[in-house]
């Protein structure tokens, strides 16, 4: 009989969001009359920007004409999209990123896991706690951890607690680590990072020959001009960091699928023989072998994000969700709850009332208010006592959810 990858057996039972879905479905079956409002998983609700729809409609028509039909595209992505990204997202912010260092993909979630294909198995890996579960689970799958303990932590990972006391920004580890996961604006806490803070991480990474995996999926929600949108705004980052970005949350591409990963050609890792190897070459080889590229139609839609009309429409979407976050923060505070995030970020991080665990609070909101959020403990042990609420929903649903909470749930 063929053997399996035993590392999958080390995964904690049930990925966070399927477990939420299971509980919600059980409740809905028992209470079919309940009008459940979901503010849990970070999926968008508003339609795609018109500029993107028009571009994709045109691209569909091109696929119906032999003279403009497109077959397999370049695995790295079409140059016309990568060049716009390089010019507007990076060079326009003073980042020396070339279009050739950008790889178009079907999701930053995929890339943050797939990047482990080119990373060795003997690295010391640091993650924040709480943390986006994908960073941890993909390392478990890849065999980079030991077993899980009673706290839900995996042996072999270095956990960096982020709490209100440190503004939900991890402190530099006292030990040497080789791989560092950072996400700003942060999922799940909604925290942001200053240039000075990120500089300390870049300095650490360069001093310790470490690599930073920087998730910038929510950078479009930054409205404070003093905050960096990219790790490459930090001096020295091109020598130590890979950045992941997505069109999912800024342009609503969660169901359309388009993202990008930046791998600078100056970034190197160590081979077993001690030689330095360019990670760009490895990632290019990996993508060429395992990935056939994002569809032409979708890439034309992503390109439209950079048109004048597209930029204005994306800005409107961002402002819409940020206004939702503002409403959530103000209404939860009115209910007597302590909240963090929701500014320069689409997530609101709520401290649960005294005596209630994260899952207790989840059940209480579901049963009493028919509102769904995400238990903080699902993001790590340090997330216990917190709860994530997403601003990704219609204004009507956000207002109704907050009305229910303020009326039925008072601290």
UniProtKB/Swiss-Prot annotation:
Required cofactor names: pyridoxal 5'-phosphate
Name the pathway it acts in. Amino-acid biosynthesis; L-lysine biosynthesis via DAP pathway; LL-2,6-diaminopimelate from (S)-tetrahydrodipicolinate (aminotransferase route): step 1/1
> What is the uppermost EC class here?
transferase
Instruction: Tell me the InterPro entries matching this sequence.
Output: Aminotransferase_I/II_large (IPR004839), DapL/ALD1 (IPR019942), PyrdxlP-dep_Trfase (IPR015424), PyrdxlP-dep_Trfase_major (IPR015421), PyrdxlP-dep_Trfase_small (IPR015422)
Matching CDD domains, A to Z?
A: AAT_like
**Which SUPFAM superfamilies does the annotation name?**
PLP-dependent transferases (SSF53383)
Name the EC number(s): 2.6.1.83
Sorted keywords for this record are:
Aminotransferase, Pyridoxal phosphate, Transferase
According to its UniProt entry, one GO biological process term is: lysine biosynthetic process via diaminopimelate, diaminopimelate-aminotransferase pathway
Per the record, what are the reactions this protein catalyses?
(2S,6S)-2,6-diaminopimelate + 2-oxoglutarate = (S)-2,3,4,5-tetrahydrodipicolinate + L-glutamate + H2O + H(+)
The residues that the entry says bind pyridoxal 5'-phosphate are 72, 108-109, 132, 187, 218, 246-248, 257, 292
Query: GO MF annotations for this entry?
Result: L,L-diaminopimelate aminotransferase activity; pyridoxal phosphate binding
Binding-site residues for substrate, renumbered to this chain: 15, 42, 109, 132, 187, 292, 388
Which residues carry the post-translational modification N6-(pyridoxal phosphate)lysine, per the record?
249
Its family remark reads:
Belongs to the class-I pyridoxal-phosphate-dependent aminotransferase family. LL-diaminopimelate aminotransferase subfamily.
Return the PANTHER family for the record. Answer: AMINOTRANSFERASE
Quaternary assembly? Homodimer.
Q: What does this protein do?
A: Involved in the synthesis of meso-diaminopimelate (m-DAP or DL-DAP), required for both lysine and peptidoglycan biosynthesis. Catalyzes the direct conversion of tetrahydrodipicolinate to LL-diaminopimelate.
* UniProt protein name: LL-diaminopimelate aminotransferase
The gene it comes from is dapL
